[in-house]
């Protein structure tokens, strides 16, 4: 869980920026968006297969160059 300790002389905007960066790095927002609506297991498998296919094609293109 991200947390930021704010110093006396530190402006709020800087602390907020640090917190947002930590949240992004931890993947909290993407996790929330993913869990926002129920996704059937069959759709999860389909998305996983499509992502694997994209990675394989990208790797293959990289090897060709």
UniProtKB/Swiss-Prot annotation:
GO biological process: translation
A Gene Ontology term for the protein's cellular component: ribosome
Gene3D superfamilies: Ribosomal protein S8
Signal peptide annotation: none
GO terms of molecular function: structural constituent of ribosome
Keywords for this protein: Ribonucleoprotein, Ribosomal protein
Region span, Disordered: 39-65
Biased composition (Basic residues): 43-65
InterPro entries the record matches: Ribosomal_bS21 (IPR001911), Ribosomal_bS21_sf (IPR038380)
Family: Belongs to the bacterial ribosomal protein bS21 family.
Protein's name in the database: Small ribosomal subunit protein bS21
Species whose genome carries this gene: Pelobacter propionicus (strain DSM 2379 / NBRC 103807 / OttBd1)
Taxonomic path: Bacteria, Pseudomonadati, Thermodesulfobacteriota, Desulfuromonadia, Desulfuromonadales
Gene designation per UniProt: rpsU
């Amino acid at each position: 869980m991200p947390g930021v300790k704010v110093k006396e002389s530190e402006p709020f905007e800087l602390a907020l920026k640090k917190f947002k960066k930590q949240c992004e790095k931890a993947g909290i927002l993407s996790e929330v968006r993913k869990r926002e609506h129920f996704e059937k297991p069959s759709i999860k498998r389909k998305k996983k297969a499509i992502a694997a296919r994209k990675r394989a094609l990208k790797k293959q293109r990289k090897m060709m160059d």
